[in-house]
């Protein structure tokens, strides 16, 4: 129990846009938000998938913080934990995870019943729910597309936190469900070859790559998380 509590506390600290909204790091997330909003000029972005090349690159932290800054804009936001293998969104917001995405896909609950309100105004969360034995099959079902359609009809912005795209097929399955995708790469950790393969994988599943975010780059000696999110680092395809 102590280990789980510590993990949750660490995740909570990483949602810096909520805990320290005036910090430099939070401002970088708002810059990313603006880039996402203007990434597609032909239509409004209603849903975005956040993924990474490999585990541990910060995609869940990025998804949580982006959800918060969109909500702080006054938009009605839904953050969906679609990482059905190693879900963490519920720990970030200290939510129960007995009912969630898997419950909805298995028709054990409606989306309305499964969604939970967060402590951030305008931000709701659909946690992963119980980890299933067949994540890819669930995510590729027609029920997933129906859920995405229902979510986009009810919310101004829907953000999907998905598994790393090179690790499993799940992110590729969801690639054409969301209006666009954002690739998170870790400074000093993600190899160029891995980033290139991740980009190719997104192209293969016909996902509209909005850009890439460099995570973990020190902005200053006072920056604990070191988040790169300026226009130059939000790289268009």
UniProtKB/Swiss-Prot annotation:
InterPro entries for the chain: AAA_dom, Bact_polysacc_biosynth/exp, P-loop_NTPase, Wzc-like_C
**Known outcome of mutating residue 81 to A:** Abolishes ATPase activity
* Catalytic EC class: transferase
Q: Does the keyword DNA-binding apply?
A: no
What EC number(s) does the entry state?
A: 2.7.10.2
The record's similarity note reads: Belongs to the CpsD/CapB family.
What this protein is called in its record is Tyrosine-protein kinase YwqD
Species of origin: Bacillus subtilis (strain 168)
User: What taxonomic lineage is listed for the species of origin?
Assistant: Bacteria, Bacillati, Bacillota, Bacilli, Bacillales
Q: Which gene is annotated as encoding this protein in its UniProt record?
A: ywqD
């Amino acid at each position: 129990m102590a280990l789980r509590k510590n993990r949750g506390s660490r995740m909570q600290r990483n949602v810096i846009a909520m805990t320290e909204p005036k910090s430099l790091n939070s401002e970088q997330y708002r810059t990313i938000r603006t880039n996402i909003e203007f990434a597609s000029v032909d239509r409004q972005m209603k849903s975005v998938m956040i993924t990474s090349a490999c585990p541990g690159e910060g995609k869940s932290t990025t998804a949580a913080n982006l959800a918060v800054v969109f909500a702080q804009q006054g938009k009605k936001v839904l953050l969906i934990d679609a990482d059905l293998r190693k879900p963490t969104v519920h720990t970030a917001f200290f939510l129960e995870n007995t009912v969630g995405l898997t419950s909805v896909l298995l028709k054990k609950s409606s989306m309305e019943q499964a969604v939970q309100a967060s402590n951030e105004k305008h931000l709701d969360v659909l946690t992963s729910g119980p980890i299933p034995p067949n994540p890819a099959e669930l995510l590729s079902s027609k029920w997933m597309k129906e859920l995405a359609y229902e979510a986009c009809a009810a919310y101004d912005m829907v953000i999907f936190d998905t598994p790393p795209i090179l690790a499993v097929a799940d992110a590729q399955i969801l690639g054409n469900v969301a209006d666009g995708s954002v690739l998170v790469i870790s400074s000093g950790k993600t190899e160029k070859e891995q980033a290139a393969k991740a980009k190719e994988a997104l192209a293969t599943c016909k996902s509209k790559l909005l850009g890439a975010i460099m995570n973990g780059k020190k902005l200053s000696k006072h920056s604990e998380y070191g988040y790169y999110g300026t226009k130059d680092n939000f790289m268009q395809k």
